[in-house]
Amino acid sequence: VLESLGVCSIQTDSEIWKRVWSEEERLNYASTPMFLVRAEKSAEQSFQLGDVTVRRGEKYQGDISFANGDIVLPGTIICGKLPGKTMLITGGVHSGEYVGIQACVELGAELQPEKTVGTIVILKVLNRPAFENRAGSLGLSDGKNLNRVFPGNPNGTEMERLAWAITKEVYPKVDYYIDLHSGDDFEALTPYVY
C-alpha cells in the first residue's frame, strides 16, 4: 500500500518508548506496544509533459506536443535541482497580447534549474496558429476566443480542442497557474508593468 503512495523508504523504531516515557510510565504502560514508523516519499526524479520528459536539475526549451501530436506549443520546462511544487505560466492565449508572450520568452531564457525549487512550465504562445499568421487574438480557423471555451471539447473546433488538451494534459500536473495578458494588438496601449 505504501509503495502505491510513492513511499521509498520505511524505518521503524520499537525502542522509542525507552526514550520518551518516564520510569513511572514504563511501569504503568509497559504492556502497551509503542513504536514509531517513519516513511519518506520519494521525490520525483523527472517531470513529464506531453512528449517531453525533463530530469531533475535540467531545462528543456522547444516544442511540446499534446493530443497525440495534434497540438504543438513552444515551451520551456525547468525542473529544479530540489523537488517542490509545479508552476505553470502561459502567454499568448490572445496571440496579439505580445507583452505576456515576451515575458514568457525572457523567463524561459533566464530561469535556471540550479536556482529553482520544484518545476516551472512555461507555455509561451497558446494560440500559436493565430500568432504565427499575425491574425489577431481569436482562433485562426474557428474565430473563437480561447479564453472563453475552457474546459474545451476533444471533438470540437480548433480552440476547443486546444482548451481540452490544456485542461486534461497540463492542469492536472501543476499546483499553481499564472496566465499572462496585456493590451491586445488592436489597442493603443503602451506596454507597462504595475
Report each predicted region and the residues it spans.
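Core SAM-dependent methyltransferase catalytic element
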Residues: 20-42
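Short coil/loop residues immediately preceding or within conserved phosphate-binding loops
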Residues: 12, 34, 72
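Structured catalytic-domain cores with a bias toward divalent-metal coordination
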Residues: 37-194
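Conserved S-adenosyl-L-methionine
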Residues: 3-21
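Structured loop/turn residues at beta-strand edges in well-structured enzyme cores
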Residues: 5, 30, 172
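Low-complexity, intrinsically disordered/propeptide-like segments
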Residues: 5-8, 24, 38-39, 52
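A generic structural signal for short
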Residues: 1, 24, 154-155
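A generic signature of intrinsically disordered, low-complexity regions enriched in glycine/proline
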Residues: 17-19, 32, 149, 183
